[in-house]
Amino acid sequence: MGGTALRTFEGRTIGWALCGSHHTLALVLDVMGQMCQAGAEIIPVVSAALAGTTTRHGTGEEHVRQIAEVAGRAPLTAIPEVEPFGPQRTLDVLLIAPCTGNTLAKLANAVTDSAPLMAAKAQLRNGRPVVVGLTTNDALGLNAQNLARLLVAKNIYFVPFGQDSPHTKPTSLVSHFDLCPDAVLAALEGRQLQPLLRSW
């Protein structure tokens, strides 16, 4: 991030929702740390899939602890904890990264059964920006209709993405998570960071 980003994040409250894409967590946390250092106040929100699942990438408890260390506060994990984001107008922007295909589909269809989705609903209630950082194997498959719905939705923006493995996983899309800071800044200005489609 350059000097402009460093200045702009001062005084900004950013909700950061993390879903169950365990293999991208280390990269996402590195970017979160950069944004904290740039002056952002990060309020982490974690899905049950991330907080309660053990994979080869670690346990849910380990992930929650790592997120708390980077953000400087314990993640919110329950729907009642994030529901006040709406009436209290807590967030300047909500970033969902990583956003799984499951969360993408539910967001597109107004399903609110997790803390990240409740945070998004609360944010959209206030007409404030939600930024989506994708990582899903079916974005160009069965989830394509949900992606299309969100691409044209008001106040929803995306971290630029591309096909990470077009020959072995032709329907997969992954956002360039290093662009999260720029995507957030653009969303705060009411615009989509361009170009949206970027190769890997």
Residue positions per predicted region:
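A cross-family phosphate/adenosyl-ligand binding-site feature
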Residues: 1-130, 135-200
